[in-house]
């Protein structure tokens, strides 16, 4: 949280697991502190972690802007990310055990194209092997 308080316009991209739940929780805390936060979630909602579902409900109750994204919504994410002060990677953390595919892979590519915007990863950058530090494939 302290690393993010210097930013006003914040985009957080959240995966379906507990790393995504951490991003959602952070987004709520920043929203409470009057930051302009936009949350983007991807994945099958039926497979979201219990913590993820809890924070999604909390974010919706607090009216934090949240978008459930598939490939058709990536252009909206890109538009918001380009206007942000920081993009927070809460897609995958220490639980990742292979190459990232689908929407997450596209998001990695798009986030890597944001040259003038700070990027902060929760845990570790998505796509990085947590044991070896070697990328599985695409990595933020």
Please give the residue ranges for each predicted region:
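N-terminal glycine-/serine-/threonine-rich phosphate-binding loop
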Residues: 1
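Glycine-rich phosphate/dinucleotide-binding loop and adjoining beta-alpha-beta core of small-molecule
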Residues: 4-140
């Amino acid at each position: 949280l302290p690393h993010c308080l210097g930013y006003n316009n914040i985009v957080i991209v959240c995966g379906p697991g507990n790393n995504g739940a951490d991003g959602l929780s952070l987004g709520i805390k920043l929203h409470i502190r009057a930051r302009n936060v936009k949350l983007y979630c991807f994945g099958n909602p039926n497979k979201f972690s219990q913590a993820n579902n809890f924070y999604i409900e909390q974010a919706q109750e607090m009216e934090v802007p949240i978008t459930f994204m598939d490939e058709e919504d990536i252009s909206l994410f890109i538009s918001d990310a380009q206007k942000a002060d920081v993009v927070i990677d809460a897609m995958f953390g220490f639980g990742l055990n292979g190459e990232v595919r689908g929407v997450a892979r596209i998001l990695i590519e798009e986030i890597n194209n944001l040259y003038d915007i700070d990027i902060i990863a929760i845990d570790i950058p998505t796509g990085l092997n947590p044991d070896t530090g070697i990328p599985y494939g695409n990595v933020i």
